Amino acid sequence: WRRGTAYLKHVEKEGSEQLRLTFEKGELKAVNDETFDDPIQAIQKVEEIGAAYGIGRDMHVGDTIIGIKGRVGFEAGAHRFLEKYTLSKWQQYWKDQVANWYGMFLHESQYLEPVMRDIEAMLQESQRNVNGTAILELRPLSFSTVGVESEDDLVKTKFGEYGEMQK
């Protein structure tokens, strides 16, 4: 064991269970309808539930500032799924471009560069309509997205329908 090492989770639970994650302006506010004032506590609750199924943590290999490959552990959530329903095509496109650029600059120790504040403002504003609940189905070693409930859902429209519609 080495300090700072991240390990994947082990399966402790069989079967499946639904997980409801509620976001307001892109921030996690409730887990299975239990509200949290502190987003860190909400994330810890998600980790507690997902860990039993061996999910929630993964590995990423990338390039480091000194030019060698590095491996890091990270945890991912349902936020991106909700964004697909509540952001337009171009909002998603530019958010992805800017987020990648921001991550690269941050990784290269450019946090104090003034443009970083501009990018943070853009990313923060992009979350104004990321409101609602993402519903996931958890199973051992995997999860799937089941649906979204949101007043800001761009799929539900009075204008018309295309493809499969969410009811």
Name each model-derived stretch:
Residues 1-167:
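Nucleotide-activated chemistry modules centered on ATP-dependent adenylation/adenylyltransferase
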